[in-house]
Structure formats: C-alpha cells, structure tokens
Amino acid sequence: MSSHARVYISNLSFEASENQLYEYLQDYNVISVLIPSQTVRGLKNKAVRPFGIAYAEFSNEEDANKVIQELNGKLFMERHLNLRMHIPIDSNKVQIVRKSSVAVVASSTAGADPSASSDTPAEAPEVASALEQQPLVKQLKSRKHRLTPFRRKKREEPAVEADIPEASTENVQETGNNETEVSEAVAGAADANAGANADANPIVTVDPVNSESSDVGNVTTVITEKPVSETIAFIGFIPRNTTDNQLREYFKGFDPQEIVVFKNRTYRRGFTFHRHFTAALVTFPDAFRLNDAKQFATQEKFRGKQINVKNAFIEKIEEVQRALEKKAGANTNGESAEGNNEIPADAGVTGDEPDTANAVAAIPIEGNPQPQADGNDGAVVEPEANAEPLIDQEDGVTASQDNPLLNSNAESQLESQQPVEQVAA
C-alpha cells in the first residue's frame, strides 16, 4: 500500500486537464494528478467526458493538509474547489445485501429467543420463503400487461404436479377430524395425478359409426398443418416489376401452365408504413415437375436473386382467385359505367325549367302586326291582317297609337320578345 497522502478534489471544471491541475498544485510538492472520465461512443466519433472530480497525491500528509487549508474554496477556472482528505474504501467492511434478505434477517433476529420452543426455528424458513417470493409476484404483476392474452391465460392457469408421492392410510394418526381431511386430500391428489397422466398422453378416439357417442371427453382435437397444393408453387419475395413471361422463361424446362404475379401487403406493428412484396403462383402439370422446379431454384438464380419455391397453401390460392374475380368484376363495372355516361340528345331540357317562350306575352302595335311565337313547338305564327288589338287583362285598356304610355310599354315588351323569337327561329 502506498504511503502517499491523497486529496479528493470536487467541483472541478469540466474543461480542466490533468496538466493544468498539476501546474496549479506544483508548489505543494504534488506527485501525481488523476481526473476520472468516461468515454462516450457515438455514431461517428468518441467523446471523453470528465466527472468533475480529481485525485491528487502528495509526498506526505503535511503537504496534503496544507493544500486543503490554503486552496479549499479557492477559485480555479471559474469554479470554487472543494478539497478534503481521501478516505479509502475497505472492501471487507462493505456488504452488498438485497432488501429482501435484510428483511428476513431483521424478522428472524427480532423474534429470536433462547428460551423459546422448538417451533420457532421451523417457522423461520416458511417466513423467509414467503418474503423471498414477494418480489417475484410484484415483478409478474408489473409485467402482466406486456403478456399476450394467450400467454396471460396460460400463466394464470394453476399448475398441476404430475409426480405426487404415494400416501398410505396406515401412517395417518387419528387426530379427530384431521383423518377425514387427510383422506380427502389423498383422493384429490390421486385424481389430479390421473388427470395429469391423461393430459400427458392424450388418446384420440374416432367413432365413425356412432357420431352421437357419449364418450366425448376422450376425443381431442388434432391440429394439422395447412393443406397445400401438389401442382401449384408459391414463389415469394421475387424482384419487383417481374412479369409472367420472365417466370415462364425461367421455368421453361418444366412446362409451366398458368402464372399469376401479385403483390402481398404486410403490416408492421409500430410503423406507419406498409411493406409490399411481389410474389407469384405457378401451376405445373404434375407434382414431379414441381419437385424438379424446386430443386432447380436452389441451384439457379432468378434475375440475380435466389428464390424459394414451395408448395402453395390452398387458402393462398383461394385468396388470389378471389382477388382476380374482384378485379375482373371491377373492370366489367367500369366499362358499363363508361357506357352510361353518354347523355341522350333529348335530355337537355328538364320538366322543372320554366318555358320562356310561353312566359313572354307579345303585344303587337296596331297597324304594324308582328309575328308571334307559338309556345308549344317554338314556330313563328304570322298574325292575320285584320287581327284585333290585344287588350290588357288587368285594366282592359287597348294598346293603340293614341295612347303614348301604352305604346311605350308595348315597344319595351316587343324589345324583350325579339330575342325569344330569334331563339325560336
């Protein structure tokens, strides 16, 4: 162990270096200076960040005490230094103990009594085990929300122990009502053992003759793999913009029949974008050609990429067929919609619009007959030579040249009538 005196310095500037601090303490016979730091590794470079403390070693304790008395609280690089003697840590005296162990020791020592009965030591392990299990239960409760519903249900199911020691009624002492309880416990354990063995070795029974058999408890559901096609191959993650002609050229030695190229969409949890990948279904004449094509794909690359050819699932084939039917139906509806967009020639006028030709009344001037527009078909009707002048329906005044007011009104109405006659013509 070194006999040098060590001084602990805190509140040190983060920009201070060991050389600067050594020059600052060289008047006090300093031997060495150490500034602890940590290295932070980033993406491009590494940064060294000091902790803001330092350790300085001196030749004797007198110099160390002198430094503490004279430089404690002094300003160094815009910071007031805090100096004190360094106290080394004795590893033999430091004990790292968990909180649960401390609680167990405290409870056991607090209840210890030399004159106590022999039942007290027997209860201590039970208390210790119960206290040791508490942090585990809390941990499971905190992680309960992270489990999926299936795993949560499986975790909450009571565990059944398959290995249960055999118990005989001969070793059971008669203690009042305890004998009945022990016998019931033994019977329950035997039933649990039988149930565990039944679960460990399930028996599948099928009765094709009598479908309404009462022995339903022994029948278990057997989960099999998804059915696949023997002549249709599924090829996933092929290069983008792949055409059926390219795949037909690649599998030309195996006589491919029908090729469908489509895009699959996969969803990722936590991301806002969706991933699309191109896949294909290739139909071969028989299963032997399909197996040869699978072996061929392991040796030859397709457009510079290794592809995986495997038997297609029946549900995937049905899904692609539904998509094709939906697309064909959409195309058919689109063509019919384009035909219905043609507007007929006689549909330009609706029944809700007022008839402008019938709404305008023509009042010709006497002696200068004007043609009138027929309201039915828009034809111009020439007035008769001896036609009587029109009479105003409101006040019964006849329009003539003797009344200048009526003549002016008639002229204004004739001006408004001329555009209608031109439209009708």
Curated annotation (Swiss-Prot):
Return the InterPro entries for the record. Nucleotide-bd_a/b_plait_sf, RBD_domain_sf, RRM_dom, Rrt5_RRM1, Rrt5_RRM2, RRT5_SRSF_SR
Q: Which cysteines are joined by disulfide bonds?
A: none
- Biased composition (Basic residues) is annotated at 140-154
- Name the record gives this protein: Regulator of rDNA transcription protein 5
What role is this protein assigned?
Answer: May be involved in the modulation of rDNA transcription.
UniProt cross-references to PANTHER family, sorted A to Z: REGULATOR OF RDNA TRANSCRIPTION PROTEIN 5 (PTHR23003:SF54), RNA RECOGNITION MOTIF RRM DOMAIN CONTAINING PROTEIN (PTHR23003)
| RRM domain ranges (all copies) | 5-88, 231-314
Calcium among keywords: no
Query: Which family, according to UniProt?
Result: Belongs to the RRT5 family.
Q: Which UniProt keywords apply?
A: Repeat, RNA-binding, Transcription, Transcription regulation
Q: Which Pfam families does the entry link to?
A: RRM_1
Q: Which PROSITE patterns match?
A: RRM
What residue spans carry the Polar residues bias annotation? Answer: 168-180, 330-339, 398-425
SUPFAM superfamilies named in the record: RNA-binding domain, RBD (SSF54928)
Q: Name one GO molecular function term.
A: mRNA binding
